[in-house]
């Protein structure tokens, strides 16, 4: 991509969503920080990311539009009610989900969750009808689903997410560590926090991943939710890597410190706060926000739009990468196959980037060791782009 400097004045409609009018001096497109042109940016919208699903190579287009969000909870009528204090029909979230699955049908089931802390593992199985899980309390921090599990947790005697079944592995593993997992399609959530409370270092291992939420079913909408962890906080990907699933996060909060939004799924983060925390790794640590493992034939991985990237825990300026490619299943560069191995895809546009973001090189080498490269590359060119971003970390 040639180096260009553009003056932008836009008031665009992307996927039916009105963006704020802005006047901005666009960052110069460089080999290490490629910027989309005005023309190219038209291909990377909410509508384009959410348009298709199914088998990679033969995707089905249904032009799904999730931008209306979950809806106002005041208009919901709960089919099932949960309260940790015992004041409702069910004391656990999982018990209510199990009841909804047992009742079956195709109509959407509404599960209200009273403000409180729910220390449990949650599974929404593939067999579940459409479910809306919500709290009437608009502060997502007041209704928390939390569990303590991690990749290195010894499997013997430990509970793992019930969506995953049994395993002969010695440790729980990354995906099995999820506090909440959604395998059904058409899942909605609002006003909730999903958290993994694992304290890194409790069990020795180089991989300290601990998932708070795993979305594995298609057409998930999550609005005003918080997803909190450290390494590998939010996982997005189908149970079969030949399939594409879609998730839409609206006005939500995601926090972590290493590869904390990862997977092969297609997801949009619209009006979200994506927060890097330096509390565990230290102020000067170098880390990564996104770690997509997008299939090479899938043009859409992760899109962050109208969002805010900030930091907490005294993170140093110019310390955090926006992301790196997760070359899932690839042990090293000698095993990487161009056009066949995963090649993560991310676009960050119309967003505010904090001073913690690295200016000259916001995209790091892949997990298999591929050096970041945007053109004329020995390996597949990275698919990471920006457009019309602002803030100290944007390069503007």
Curated annotation (Swiss-Prot):
Q: What is its EC number?
A: 3.1.1.11
Site (Transition state stabilizer) at: 231
Q: Where does the record place the catalytic residues?
A: 232 (proton donor), 259 (nucleophile)
The UniProt catalytic activity note for this protein reads: [(1->4)-alpha-D-galacturonosyl methyl ester](n) + n H2O = [(1->4)-alpha-D-galacturonosyl](n) + n methanol + n H(+)
Sorted alphabetically, the Gene Ontology BP terms of this entry are: cell wall modification; pectin catabolic process
Look up the signal peptide feature and give its range: 1-26
Respond yes or no to whether keyword DNA repair is given for this record: no
Q: Which residues cross the membrane?
A: none
Q: What Pfam families does its record include? A: Pectinesterase (PF01095)
User: Is the Cell membrane keyword given for this protein?
Assistant: no
Q: Which branch of life, at top level?
A: Bacteria
Q: Write out the annotated subcellular location.
A: Secreted
Q: Which SUPFAM superfamilies match?
A: Pectin lyase-like
Broad class of the protein's primary localization: secreted
Q: List ligand-binding residues for substrate.
A: 174, 324, 326
Spell out the GO cellular component terms annotated for this protein, sorted alphabetically and separated by semicolons: cell outer membrane; extracellular region
Its job: Involved in maceration and soft-rotting of plant tissue.
**Family of the protein in this entry:** Belongs to the pectinesterase family.
Q: What is this protein called?
A: Pectinesterase
**Organism for this UniProt entry:** Ralstonia solanacearum
